């Protein structure tokens, strides 16, 4: 059955949203404001999934996708939408999530942070599959909503130097001893080097090593090898062990890293994000600052150039060791401290043990920082950071954590905005600023939170006894 629908909005999977007979329809390929005919492909009790058959009235924001693989490849979802409109949808999603999850509205919306629209992805994981029906070896991202590997010949979100490697990599893998036992190639670009990490499930032969070296010489790349877990990653050539680094020119910093370390995908946006975060924190020379989930010290080292001391805490000792080395190399050893700790299990006693911080930066993974913000919310007015900047890659956990800080801890959500870290995708990176309110407001929020917790405990006890 073909229906005619008016598309009202867009979700973060780039599906148009419409309503019919009290039911939500998610329409693949449709944009807000468009009138389309659709074919339903899946029916559920509360919603349907459909695909566009014909666009009767196109959106003024619709653009021609640059990539010939768009719609099949799962690497991008929004190439058919103008970049500014993509960011507007992400901003709306952030604001909606704050309200629906936390009943919060930022006092101020920060202007979006923009960067390169194409060629921005300096880190990627490419899958490798042998598919005889498609001509042999495929190297690329997965197909949209599928475990199959897309038949990619180019990629416009990868830097051109990497996009040009997709077809040569196919031929190289095909020439090796066990192409079907090499499932993955990770790509990591520094400011001066391209590193490829080959995952191989069988030992490489001398012939395989020769093939890798010939490819590296021809294409100007460096090979690292991974036979098992992350601890087995090592450079094919020993002299390449310290090849990767990115820079933060505003702060005079060079940050070395290994190809499997976590670094931001988009180097240009990362520089802008660090700059904005420090401006929002407004660190003073006498301030002591904490950087939680600090990784390689992406924020810690810039903070140390401005404050009295920066303390970075991270769950990976390998990362904190590299952060410490980078700090020492830049003469910041006496103004930085690093600790290795699982920040998903901390409590208020641990937080107090770190001492007083004037400012705090929190940059967690997608799981958010629930344990950290619960501990923060229990701190007395005189022992808590006055200002906190929270960098997030998941609006849902940011909104959850913000609700704890505001409703239970007496913080105010002063501002928030999106960072366009991943153009053409539904990923939403954002930044939010919290400030501690006056003592009376903090104590009132904490008292109300304790009362609510008591009432919930009593309710659960009554339910268990019934």
From Swiss-Prot:
It catalyses: uridine(1939) in 23S rRNA + S-adenosyl-L-methionine = 5-methyluridine(1939) in 23S rRNA + S-adenosyl-L-homocysteine + H(+). One of its GO terms (biological process) is rRNA base methylation. It comes from the Bacteria. S-adenosyl-L-methionine binds at residues 264, 293, 298, 314, 342, 363. It is an enzyme of class 2 (transferase). It holds the Pfam family tRNA_U5-meth_tr. [4Fe-4S] cluster binds at residues 67, 73, 76, 155. Residues 1-54 form the TRAM domain. HAMAP family: 23SrRNA_methyltr_RlmD. This is 23S rRNA (uracil(1939)-C(5))-methyltransferase RlmD. It comes from Bordetella parapertussis (strain 12822 / ATCC BAA-587 / NCTC 13253). The gene is rlmD.
